[in-house]
Amino acid sequence: MPESPIRKLAPLAAAAKKRGTKVYHLNIGQPDLPTPREGLEALKNINRDILEYSPSQGYQSYREKLVGYYKKYNINVCADDIIITSGGSEAVLFAFLSCLNPGDEIIVPEPAYANYMAFAISAGAKIKTIATTIDEGFSLPKVEKFEELINERTRAIMICNPNNPTGYLYTRREMNQIRDLVKKYDLYLFSDEVYREYIYTGSPYISACHLEGIEQNVILIDSVSKRYSECGIRIGALITKNAAVRAAVMKFCQARLSPPLIGQIIAEASLDAPEEYYRDVYDEYVERRKCLIDRLNRIPGVYSPIPMGAFYTVAKLPVDDAEKFCRWCLEKFEYEGETVMMAPAAGFYTTPGAGINQVRIAYVLKKDDLIRALVVLRKALELYPGRVDDQ
């Protein structure tokens, strides 16, 4: 089981704080923007004598309300197609456990969210990665590269759109390419779409559920964590029109008893957040993205493509080893009492040596803090003993 590149340096950050150093957390996608008032009010107004189990599939009222939410994105589902999970992570795990046998293979573009690898191991499955590169903005390679990986054990393709960790948004051509592969080889398509609200290019959001001819192959993964700054309530969803898959998933749902009661109450109420809430959050991320990328690419030796969605970017640094650099920042460096914490990007790859000089940065800090964090990062790169200028 691999360590999380997002969390494994947390003890070093804790030690730095204990020494009195301020740490700017660019490592984790924990939004700092407020949870919708509607969700917080629902939490305050809970008045129950018993906090009982909820149904294993999730509350009917919440699932019915989600139908209306998805309809806004032209995702046409019914309440029975939706299974509420303990976060999007459980949805991914249950999808793998329900659709894959030990030894089955999933094709995943890399870099990829590191927990996909961990969940595949839990299911006894194997991740086969297809390379995307920072120099090409993490766009997908040609279909032939996918077909080179497909064999008798291939069961699925997994995508995250918009992408974590890269911020890439798949084009219509790329989504059609994936659809054609899924249809040709009768594969499952696991599609993690938790960042659909955050698309910055004017390009359309194309859900896997929009792809014609593979409706029975698609398993959509969703979560309220990033949409409403509700990471702590652990509410996600698995959505599919495939009744056999739903039946298999429900066995795991019954084994874990129920998704969180309190979390569902908050998540259901949060669906009533006004459009102004979404607009304000979106506008804030637009500003942060511009602030980050403009300043990041002005640091000598640093390069980041412009992320098209989500609130992450992967940046190339002028260092010998990004993980060593991230450790050094927390253990041996501080500038005016401050340092930065980032996620070493090698942990988002399975190919040995890939991403060795890259980091994932989450722009989840207020603009002033983001600007200051980049000042500290620039100074750290100037002083780092393992700096490499010619790459």
Features from the language model and the residues they span:
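PLP-dependent class I/II
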Residues: 2, 9, 16-24, 29-46, ...
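Generic structural signal for well-ordered alpha-helical scaffold segments
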Residues: 14, 67, 71, 96-97
